[in-house]
Amino acid sequence: MGVSSRARWVALGLGVLGLLCAALGVIMILMVPSLIKQQVLKNVRIDPSSLSFGMWKEIPVPFYLSVYFFEVVNPSEVLNGQKPVVRERGPYVYREFRQKVNITFNDNDTVSYIENRSLRFQPDRSQGSESDYIVLPNILVLGGAVMMEDKPTSLKLLMTLGLVTMGQRAFMNRTVGEILWGYEDPFVNFLSKYFPDMFPIKGKFGLFVGMNDSSSGVFTVFTGVQNFSKIHLVDKWNGLSEVNYWHSEQCNMINGTAGQMWAPFMTPESSLEFFSPEACRSMKLTYQESRVFEGIPTYRFTAPDTLFANGSVYPPNEGFCPCRESGIQNVSTCRFGAPLFLSQPHFYNADPVLSEAVLGLNPDPKEHSLFLDIHPVTGIPMNCSVKMQLSLYIKSVKGVGQTGKIEPVVLPLLWFEQSGMMGGKTLNTFYTQLVLMPQVLHYAQYVLLGLGGLLLLVPIIYQLRSQEKCFLFWSGSKKGSQDKEAMQAYSESLMSPAAKGTVLQEAKL
């Protein structure tokens, strides 16, 4: 086989290979997006065979609860009508462990479960210990006084007598552990005995009683196996399709997810909605910006200005009233009537009147705004920091001597941050399976298409060059034949008689 023949077959082979590569690239361009979508849907639904099921069942990411207290520096002056001065103490950090138990798959494409939660103090991450003493408003005294304000004078006098007998004061000096996880107080038994409708609490009293070694109730959520459009959405909480704490149907609705995973394939127009049993309501976060977390593209969602706006600023929130200044939410209806308010830390994004009424507050968007960074393709959180503040409304109540001359004020008690970020083996698995592989497939389809196009050019160029050589050879042969004929004619003319005479004459000259 000659050299030209081998070259022809090589060019033809490369052309066939290029055609196959180009065809495969086109097929991948048409099919890969659908394949990636199917793979994502398969792995984010709540199903024992899905990649994310283990992550959903027992969160492998270390979560931390960081608590900051607002210690009252001038309690005596506050009782005399002066402005409160507070000093931030903390953080007191707890590692949070969560595990779903009693998982039951139902026939209507839902799954029911209880999520057990436990908190363990982390001394190495904390600025202090659980034995630190902190001066705070006595919630039982000052909160109870506000709750009794419209009651008959005789009841208020009975309450005052009970407070005096038990040595209760407007402000208390207790340890971090007691404030959070509860303390024995005879006044609690007194209140539950004489005012059972107003104070249906028994045993220990603490701000976070019921949050440790406990659960947030029974959740029933959609799995997304049969109906993807409802994936992760809460169907019921404790058997309820809506709560009854608020004064409008919209505010009582249980919307969104349980706050751990959301529907995949988000866009900047998507919102992040979830139901929070601790806040007794559903919340909605909005898109702020696109970011990158450890090489993974994310969307950052933050709290809009309307989250805790009052009804006059944002009419849909009217159902959460009675309201005070904008930026705080009255949660008394789900906290036994106690005048407690929820907001962002240091009254960030709230009416400035609130932070100006208390010395020592410095709202800062970098320090006090909440955010969730979500991988938009899967709806799985990569990095989150949820920050909330709990405040108590206090004032002087006529008939309750312990309230002195306290001016009406929403006084911050503490703020807390629940934070966590994906890392380690979990992050590597997530990145490889749900980010790297789709990216490889995405780029491979265009590489194959480009390579196929280049290889297809090989036989085309070879054919063009072969035709050019043939043309040059044919042209060269034709020209050579014409020159040979001309030379022969010229030689014959020289041998003729006339030509000979001419030559001799020229020689003589």
From Swiss-Prot:
Q: Which organism is it from?
A: Rattus norvegicus
Checking Pfam families in the record gives: CD36
Attached carbohydrates are found at N102, N108, N116, N173, N212, N227, N255, N310, N330, N383
Membrane topology per the record? Multi-pass membrane protein
* Membrane spanning stretches: 12-32, 441-461
Q: What is this protein called?
A: Scavenger receptor class B member 1
**Processing and modification events after translation:** N-glycosylated. The six cysteines of the extracellular domain are all involved in intramolecular disulfide bonds.
Keyword Transmembrane in record: yes
